[in-house]
Amino acid sequence: MNGLMNGKRGLIMGVANSHSIAWGIAKSLAAQGAELAFTYQGEALGKRVKPLAAEVNSDFLLPCDVEDIGSVDAVVDAIKERWGKLDFVVHAIGFSDKNELKGLYADTTRDNFSRTMVISCFSFTEIAKRAAELMSEGGTMLTLTYGGSMRVMPNYNVMGVAKAALEASVRYLAADYGSRGIRVNAISAGPIRTLAGAGISDARAMLSWQQKNSPLRRTVTIEDVGSSALYLLSDLSRGVTGEIHYVDSGYNITSMPTLEALRVADAD
């Protein structure tokens, strides 16, 4: 099926490089005809994003710092001026002090807790509120979460709390905007080698563990996530909102490692 996103215009937030999950999503959308705008934070990231945007025939790049609400407003104003409307938004933004992702969650500082929540969670609500004003004919919103929102994951700490709040936000925003034909969903992806993932200690070991213990016995790719995002952002999912869609090779359904892994652990 081709042309699923023909005539659709959307904003992609969170591309850092060619390994970003947001980039995998952007490629899938562009391949189906979507016209894309990209945000970036700072000149260094802007230099990385510009050639990627060009690969999908986009010259619409906008600086954005989600900690500065004026910056968010400027992005929405620029989209309104150029396009007049918006069909979808992809929010792939998260941050926490990596030094506080190690050790005890209880040692999280007040400052890092607040900043993590604003960037990783509340920014989606602020963007959704403004984007909705450009979706007079309906639209879709998508954010990214992780299994650490539901279960304790090593070296994730306050990010797990932020992702749990983000998932709750998805449900409340879906309820807020459903009557206006605006759908809101999230993808919970398994661990992927990304710039953000590099901030998590022992990320390589976590990737290996999922590969060995998920039902599909493999990790996921940005292309896997991109395909699911295409479904959630297109009319194929027109009856779906408020959902957390797992793309993790089925790891979320497991409660124990494989028997092989248990035997190895027992032998140790």
Swiss-Prot record:
Record's keyword annotation contains Endoplasmic reticulum: no
Provide the GO MF annotations for this entry: enoyl-[acyl-carrier-protein] reductase (NADH) activity
This protein's UniProt keywords: Cell inner membrane, Cell membrane, Fatty acid biosynthesis, Fatty acid metabolism, Lipid biosynthesis, Lipid metabolism, Membrane, NAD, Oxidoreductase
Active site residues per record: Y146 (proton acceptor), Y156 (proton acceptor)
Enzyme category, top tier: oxidoreductase
Positions binding NAD(+) in this chain are G14, S20, I21, Q41, D65, V66, I93, K163, I192, R193, T194, L195, A196
| GO annotation, cellular component aspect | plasma membrane
Q: Which Gene3D superfamilies match?
A: Enoyl acyl carrier protein reductase, NAD(P)-binding Rossmann-like Domain
Site annotation (Involved in acyl-ACP binding) points to: R204
Q: What single Pfam family name could you report for this chain, choosing any that match? A: adh_short_C2
Q: Where in the cell is it found?
A: Cell inner membrane
* Gene Ontology BP term (one): fatty acid biosynthetic process
Catalysed reactions, semicolon-separated:
a 2,3-saturated acyl-[ACP] + NAD(+) = a (2E)-enoyl-[ACP] + NADH + H(+)
Does Lipid biosynthesis count among this protein's keywords? yes
| Pathway(s) of this molecule | Lipid metabolism; fatty acid biosynthesis
| EC numbers for this chain | 1.3.1.9
Task: Provide the membrane topology annotation.
Answer: Peripheral membrane protein
| Family membership noted in the UniProt record | Belongs to the short-chain dehydrogenases/reductases (SDR) family. FabI subfamily.
NCBIfam families according to UniProt:
PRK06505.1
Protein name, as recorded: Enoyl-[acyl-carrier-protein] reductase [NADH] 2
